């Protein structure tokens, strides 16, 4: 039987940074992941990227990961938000964010997920107090007042003070614990693709609000951008089934000509859009983190940043408890994490849901109202700067890691 302080179920983009933070703080941590290591470390480009807010970048820098990622990261210097219809000029009222206005050289970075994974695993390989068990999954979890007994699918057992579920939106551990969720589906599909274009993007990200949903163009390294295209469920299958020439024509109708000729390269991904929020984030000796706790609409590109804030807060709570000699898995210890994170997650979920409902329609009075709103925010400097700081993850009670300090 193996002994650890913490067992993390899920070695993804939230579970790995959490494990590194805990291990660097001196807690013996085991990460369990269902995917074979060869799959996790596959260097092939799969088209998926993440937007990292600058608070998340500070966290990764403290963990020693950012130096490995920086050569693969594209800074976002500006963001332009417009409203309109496919194939027509955008509204004259728009919203423009510029990093220089908040004294920064970027509002965040776009990084391919494969590079994030490989950088995290490179740090994991040389870390003390940290071990990866893969491929394996948690088969059962037995909770007592004195500890947690984790049984894996390879029949190995681990005792720990705390088990963390960072194991996807359909978290098996969350289900085992009987923690319910509030959830609903959107009548939309997310289409993800990579686009090559003639002209340089100059680090500018675009978000076009179309009647079917947001159409985001995120700058990548080189003359490439990642496309996050929200489309109505009824139309998405036909678009996904188009041959390359026809797909690029549909792309151009929405993309515009500001970057010259464009073409889709690499695989296209699609996924149904939904919302969920766990009714509880903690039980005795169990904490939910990242997608296991919440899932939001991608309209603001904040999903990973929200999960990294979970990881930073949970690491701080557990390391503080360890320094004070407290029981890491006691309910009062873990409730501090829940109180800290629940409001932020609920507020982000509500705002992304509201934005999607406001902008994903073609009702003329609403369209005029939202265009006016974009223009007003653009005209009011303090409001513009507030939204930029919010997008950068620099508001509210930040965990130490998000401030660039050790947990």
Regions found by a protein language model. Give the residues of each.
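N-terminal FAD cofactor-binding segment of flavoenzymes
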Residues: 44-86
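C-terminal helical "tail/cap" subdomain of flavin- and related membrane-associated enzymes
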Residues: 316-407
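Glycine-rich FAD pyrophosphate-binding loop
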Residues: 23-45
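N-terminal Rossmann-like FAD-binding beta1-loop-alpha1 element of flavoenzymes
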Residues: 4-31
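Central beta-strand plus flanking loop segment that forms part of the substrate or channel wall
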Residues: 170-205, 223-225, 231-235, 251-252
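Conserved FAD/dinucleotide-binding core of flavoprotein oxidoreductases
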Residues: 100-102, 210-272
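Conserved N-terminal helical subregion
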Residues: 72-176, 184-189, 398
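FAD-binding beta-loop-beta segment adjacent to the flavin cofactor pocket
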Residues: 272-288, 346-347
